[in-house]
């Protein structure tokens, strides 16, 4: 099930229509773009609601969005992934265990450690991660030099969108992880994302992106785009 972007969520909530911009257009013209948006709506007033339940349009009908998400996560793990990838039912607990460990740990992963933790081979761990990526439970980030992701070891793993974080993560206080997950979920459908190594993301083989929270400032390099929250207007590379 494809989800709503924050732009689409704002359109549903406010009744306004907003243009679609490429990542490059936002980087180059965000100071002008935001003027048009703020004439109609204050996006920050809707941001936390989107993080909690706005990705899936079912929120318009389903009040208990957490129960809905948990039900669909289980359906995906117990039926969709095993059916599409010929996984024997006896291995379902391994699949669920891997998801739980990955999403409640650091986004940087160690395949050998995961293999030992759930008791399967490294190749099986990689397969399971790719299966969950294809099922839109996870997003995998690979080295910036990688052209073909099939079968490769990811450098980082994130849940597919922040609503899933709200449903399955034990630690609800890691706001930086929420912001990173949000940004990745917005970009992955429209841009090529890679693990940067230097910063948080390498976008379209060109842009170094660093994620900050609560208006925090980065190192101020012109070559690095700073993505921060809780501000209505950015300036230059922020």
What are these regions (language model features)?
Residues 14-17, 154-155, 237-238:
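Short, surface-exposed amphipathic charged segments that create phosphate/polyanion-binding patches used
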Residues 57-199:
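Accessory nucleic acid-recognition modules appended to NTPase machines
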Residues 194-198, 213-238:
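Catalytic cores of nucleic-acid endonucleases
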Residues 55, 206-207, 238:
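Well-ordered beta-strand scaffold positions
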Residues 4-8, 165, 231-236:
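A short acidic, often aromatic-flanked loop/helix-cap motif at beta-alpha or helix-coil junctions
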Residues 1-95:
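Interdomain motor-coupling "hinge/lid" segment immediately C-terminal to the ATP-binding subdomain
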Residues 47, 153-154, 221:
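A structure-centric signal for secondary-structure junctions around beta-strands
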Residues 20, 183, 187, 199-217:
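Conserved catalytic cores of phosphodiester-cleaving nucleases, focusing on short active-site segments
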